[in-house]
Amino acid sequence: MAAPWVLPAPLSPAQLKRLEQHRYSSAGRSLLEPWLQPYWGWLVERLPPWLAPNAITLGGLLLNCLTALPLIASCPTATEQAPFWAYILGALGLFIYQSLDAIDGKQARRTNSSSPLGELFDHGCDSISTVFVVLGSCIAIRLGTNPDWLFFCCFVGLFMFYSAHWQTYVSGILRFGKVDVTEVQIAITMLLLVSAFCGTAVWDYKVHLVGLELKFFAVVGILCGTAVSCFNYFRIIFGGGVGKNGSTIAVAHMTKSEISLQDTAFIGPGLLFLDQYFNSFIDEYVVLWIALFISLFDMLRYATGVCLQIAAHLHIHVFRISSHQAPEQVQNHND
């Protein structure tokens, strides 16, 4: 058996017991969803019945990350012009990820393999993918020319993801707005295609009527969407993450338990804070790499520990459809 610091068991017996009572519940329908449902239905019918939903989710995440990496590597400051194929690859990877993310739940219901582990796996992968999607969109419109806006757009995506699951933690229902994640992913796919065929310089074109570059219209759209979504989320939160944080709040909601204030996820940011506090006595670039590896290791060990622990408790497999499956756990908004 692996040491606890390598492969922890984050959930208590009481949390695992409450996990059995969890039922996924969602409400709302976004604008594009009715139009995409036939495509998603057709796509899921092409999948073999032995393919596990979690394998679909993980495959989509890996594809999205791998297709975004060439774009990130080509544009380290989000001001460069990447090769044509990098934008096409990023757009294709994001579209495929969106498609797979939409059908993993359908495959679970189709094969009678729905479980709390599948919901957690889906949200956990989304929390990681959010980082790459946001970076891809910022690179597509060359937002690195305005570092303040780049910083804002990167973190507003993570904040909105966390807030969506925060209101789910409070209300027990994952709510979808008219403009939600599907619309955002399709819009970013279009941004990548425009940058591929027109070049990123097109986003620097200034609209003389208002004196603003085209890229700022995208930022204004983000601002408006954020304001509306925040109003809807916090109206529920006050009335009642991302990365590991996004997974942690999903686990807390599903196990009906409190979120721990002490978390090893704070080690990486803590190192960066201390290095700044002591006037960068260690090179910032070195500390950033150290924080990255610590955070990556911490996220992987937490996610692996939770998935294996839940799978063992429910007597199911993570990446295989088991002969014994948990009872139906889904109350969906769009089926």
From Swiss-Prot:
Cofactor: Mg(2+); Mn(2+)
Annotated positions for site Increases basicity of active site His: 119
Catalytic activity: CDP-choline + a 1,2-diacyl-sn-glycerol = a 1,2-diacyl-sn-glycero-3-phosphocholine + CMP + H(+); 1-octadecanoyl-2-(5Z,8Z,11Z,14Z-eicosatetraenoyl)-sn-glycerol + CDP-choline = 1-octadecanoyl-2-(5Z,8Z,11Z,14Z-eicosatetraenoyl)-sn-glycero-3-phosphocholine + CMP + H(+); 1-hexadecanoyl-2-(9Z-octadecenoyl)-sn-glycerol + CDP-choline = 1-hexadecanoyl-2-(9Z-octadecenoyl)-sn-glycero-3-phosphocholine + CMP + H(+); 1-hexadecanoyl-2-(4Z,7Z,10Z,13Z,16Z,19Z-docosahexaenoyl)-sn-glycerol + CDP-choline = 1-hexadecanoyl-2-(4Z,7Z,10Z,13Z,16Z,19Z-docosahexaenoyl)-sn-glycero-3-phosphocholine + CMP + H(+)
Pathway it works in: Phospholipid metabolism; phosphatidylcholine biosynthesis; phosphatidylcholine from phosphocholine: step 2/2
Domain of life of the native organism: Eukaryota
InterPro entries per the UniProt record, alphabetical: CDP-OH_P_trans (IPR000462), CDP-OH_PTrfase_TM_dom (IPR043130), CDP_ALCOHOL_P_TRANSF_CS (IPR048254), CHOPT (IPR014472)
Record-stated family: Belongs to the CDP-alcohol phosphatidyltransferase class-I family.
Protein name: Cholinephosphotransferase 1
Organism: Gallus gallus
Gene from which the chain derives: CHPT1
